[in-house]
């Protein structure tokens, strides 16, 4: 049977695993590194190119929150408080959710979010009424911390729940059309650049 999937996102439009076994095991180091590398690869591929795109790194705090959110097995976003981390700074994080009927592959989840760029025009926003918030969160320049979790929820129609948290959150309503500053790669990095991404540690 074909795998059905459904995706949701939240990032303050201002406006291994599983859920029912009594625990919330974290993703292993190999998976963490893969997810960071995949996000950075996609962030390097934005079009137009980005002057200020930060390199992502793993956040244990964001990962714990994402895992706890997945393990709740509910089809709704976690609250701002549940998406908050204190280290290295006090951030509220954005949240992307991907649910499937079969155990997902993380590449499919992350690429499904990023592929919303096909319905997005930089400086204009979504084409018609298309969903683009997953893409803009993945491509949000000032987001640099990532944490993800996965849970199996056998009582759900879509039993596999994959969640990533992004800190600090993106998708601020006043800049949703420009999730990063367009221009020559790394032209606006405050200090260093590594393979098209800014590597300076942000401040609060």
From Swiss-Prot:
One of its GO terms (cellular component) is membrane. GO terms for biological process: chemotaxis. It comes from the Eukaryota. The chain crosses the membrane at residues 140-161. Residues 36-138 form the SCP domain. It is found in: Membrane; Secreted. InterPro entries: Allrgn_V5/Tpx1_CS, CAP_dom, CAP_sf, CRISP-related, V5_allergen-like. Keywords: Membrane, Secreted, Signal, Transmembrane, Transmembrane helix. Pfam families: CAP (PF00188). Its main location: membrane. Expressed only in oviduct. Residues 1-19 form the signal peptide. Involved in sperm chemoattraction. PANTHER family: CYSTEINE-RICH SECRETORY PROTEIN-RELATED. Belongs to the CRISP family. This is Allurin. It comes from Xenopus tropicalis. The gene is crisp-a.
